[in-house]
Each structure stands twice: as C-alpha cells, then as structure tokens.
Amino acid sequence: MEHYRAIWISDVHLGTPGCQAKYLLDFLKHNESDTLYLVGDIIDGWRLKKSIYWPQSHNDVVQKILRKARKGTEVVYVPGNHDESIRQFLGLSFGDIRVVPEAIHTTADGRKLWITHGDLFDGVMQYAK
C-alpha cells in the first residue's frame, strides 16, 4: 500500500460507458493519502441527463471515496463543468466530503498550489451555457 500526502483525481466521468471505474477502484484500493482532491468531472452529469448509465463499478468508486473520507482522509471536491450541478452545494459537506469552488494545497516545502477546474478559463464553455 502506497501512502501520499495528496492525490489529485479529475475527469473520471462516472456515468459514461468509457469511464475506467475498475482501474480507478484498484488505484484507490492500493493508494492512501492524507488529502484526496477530486478536481472536477468526477460524475458526468451531462451524460446522465441524456440517459442513465451507472454500473456497479461506478457505485463502488463512490462508496470507496466515501469510506476513505469516513476513515480520516480529507476529501475535497472541486466541481467541474460536467458535474456543475454540484456547485449548488459549495461550502457544504456530504459524507465528510467538502464541496468547494477552489482549494489551496500546501506542499511539504511550504509552497502553495491553487486547485481549480479548468472550465473557468474555457471561453467556449463559459458561453455555451
């Protein structure tokens, strides 16, 4: 089992047939961290609005993340454009997962990293809504 100070995961797109949920679940089972950052497009709300696709492996990923949060991993969710509906819950916590518009991570040597989803800088996405 590997342990890291922080792990960043983005663009998983749970809810789509192309999602590699089994690989992600295997990664989550073999890697621990003090903080787990979910940096947007974890769930593909755009796809789920069109048709429901949610196999057991996608549910298993969500359950694994919730278990990590319950066991003490700080889980921070920064929504992206495909899971933008979650932005209505900014500032709240769900199952010990904090939903925030952005985050700051401090590295071991004291540097600060700003964490946000790139759709904020995508002019096409900003005007496509």
Question: Can you describe what each PLM-predicted range is?
Answer:
Residues 11, 46, 125-129:
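Proteins with a high burden of low-complexity, intrinsically disordered sequence enriched in S/T/G/P/A and R
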Residues 2-5, 14-108:
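Core catalytic region of metal-dependent phosphoesterases/phosphodiesterases
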